[in-house]
Amino acid sequence: MHLLIAAAGSGRRMGADRNKLLLPLLGRPLIAWTVDAALTATEISWIGIVGQDIDRAEILDALGSVKKPLVWIQGGATRQESVLRGLAGLPEGARHVLIHDGARCLVQPDLFDRCAVAVEAGAALIAATPVTDTIKRVDEHGMIRDTPDRAELWAAQTPQGFEVEQLRQGHVRAQAEGWSVTDDASLFERLGWSVQVLDAGPSNIKVTTPFDLTVAEAVLSSRTTP
């Protein structure tokens, strides 16, 4: 399975002036933990890091020598453009792809493997977790409009997996139509294509704020403590 890791993370909400994926996490850059999980996953055979040129040297230096094919792909101005460039950078003949946020550094190798197996069996899917809070839909004034049924709500995460050519066609269509979506599954929804969820468990968080970084440190410490 081919894996694209989105690595153009901003440090703005972390209060940092650099890519948050380069922030230290238990003595290593955050992205190193993400890549470690991909390297350990038995179903992942190729890794593409999609990022900005300003971060290239530092990210690749942080990863060091790895035992799987790993390439750098220059990202675009938006996530959508970066994914399209990532697809263009896949090896010739690649049929399926997983796309993962570099900031989800708590991902477990098993999650990559489960997603890969399901995608290769024909599914378009996203890792997700059932929503446990009661969700309120509000209007522009902050007044509650209604309460969606929590049993139907899942929080979308990554990896997200698709057939390469179908995903490429979707992004080309989005580019032509001027659509803006927050993830690849939203693009499939807009085109009427089916996507299923795969339960990622509770710990597959995206590190976005300083609090998230504290949580990630605690989780990783618990995993590495004998």
Swiss-Prot record:
It is an enzyme of class 2 (transferase). Keywords: Isoprene biosynthesis, Nucleotidyltransferase, Transferase. This is 2-C-methyl-D-erythritol 4-phosphate cytidylyltransferase. GO terms for molecular function: 2-C-methyl-D-erythritol 4-phosphate cytidylyltransferase activity. Pfam families: IspD. It comes from the Bacteria. Belongs to the IspD/TarI cytidylyltransferase family. IspD subfamily. The record marks R13, K20 as: Transition state stabilizer. The record marks R150, K206 as: Positions MEP for the nucleophilic attack. It comes from Synechococcus sp. (strain CC9902). Pathway: Isoprenoid biosynthesis; isopentenyl diphosphate biosynthesis via DXP pathway; isopentenyl diphosphate from 1-deoxy-D-xylulose 5-phosphate: step 2/6. CDD domains: CDP-ME_synthetase (cd02516). One of its GO terms (biological process) is isopentenyl diphosphate biosynthetic process, methylerythritol 4-phosphate pathway. Catalyzes the formation of 4-diphosphocytidyl-2-C-methyl-D-erythritol from CTP and 2-C-methyl-D-erythritol 4-phosphate (MEP). Its EC number is 2.7.7.60. The lineage of its organism: Bacteria, Bacillati, Cyanobacteriota, Cyanophyceae, Synechococcales. It catalyses: 2-C-methyl-D-erythritol 4-phosphate + CTP + H(+) = 4-CDP-2-C-methyl-D-erythritol + diphosphate.
